[in-house]
């Protein structure tokens, strides 16, 4: 009887985990779309602010001044 109960509970957990992962997959797709839209935005011109994730048009960020190089 105990073995049957354990198998039943395991099956319930697997079914719940599968359903949850499907919901998360939708959110992952949305996050991926959001990330792609950020990557397609325009670059920061020289003198503009840049940081750890610089998107400078010149591909060069002066970390000390936190500005994009020319």
From Swiss-Prot:
A GO MF label: toxin activity
Keyword set, alphabetical order: Disulfide bond, Knottin, Secreted, Signal, Toxin
Tree of life domain: Eukaryota
Coiled coil: none
Pfam family, one: Conotoxin
Pro-piece positions: 18-41
Annotated stretches, region: Disordered: 20-41
Subcellular location: Secreted
Protein name: Conotoxin AbVIB
Organism of provenance: Conus abbreviatus (Abbreviated cone)
């Amino acid at each position: 009887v105990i073995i049957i109960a354990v198998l039943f509970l395991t099956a319930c957990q697997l079914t719940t985990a599968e359903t949850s992962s499907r919901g998360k997959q939708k959110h992952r797709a949305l996050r991926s779309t959001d990330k792609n839209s950020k990557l397609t935005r325009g670059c920061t011109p020289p003198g503009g602010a840049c940081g750890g994730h610089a998107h400078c048009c010149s591909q060069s960020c002066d970390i000390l001044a936190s500005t994009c190089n020319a």
